[in-house]
Amino acid sequence: MNSEKIIEVIIAIFLPPVAVFMKCGATTPLWINLVLCIFIWFPAILHALYVVLKD
C-alpha cells in the first residue's frame, strides 16, 4: 500500500462519498454511496472502502 492509497482509505472512513467521488467521479457508485450515507453511515463506509480498495 502506498501513501496515496492510505490517504484514500482514511478519507473513505471519515467522508465516504468524497472518497468514492475521487475514485469514480459522478457515476453510479457515488449515488449508491450517497444514498447509503444518508440512511445508514456504516454501510457507506464499507462501500467506500470496497470502491477504494478493489483495484
Swiss-Prot record:
One protein family per Pfam: Pmp3
Residue stretches spanning the membrane: 3-23, 31-51
Entry keyword annotation includes Oxidoreductase: no
Annotated disulfide bonds: none
Membrane topology term: Multi-pass membrane protein
Alphabetical UniProt keywords: Membrane, Transmembrane, Transmembrane helix
InterPro entries on file: PMP3
GO BP terms in the entry: filamentous growth of a unicellular organism; plasma membrane organization
PROSITE patterns: UPF0057
GO cellular component entries: plasma membrane
The organism's place on the tree of life at top rank: Eukaryota
Intracellular or extracellular location(s): Membrane
Main location: membrane
Record flagged with keyword Lyase: no
Function statement: Plays a role in the regulation of membrane potential.
Family label: Belongs to the UPF0057 (PMP3) family.
Protein name as catalogued: Plasma membrane proteolipid 3 homolog
Organism annotation: Candida albicans
Gene that encodes it: PMP3
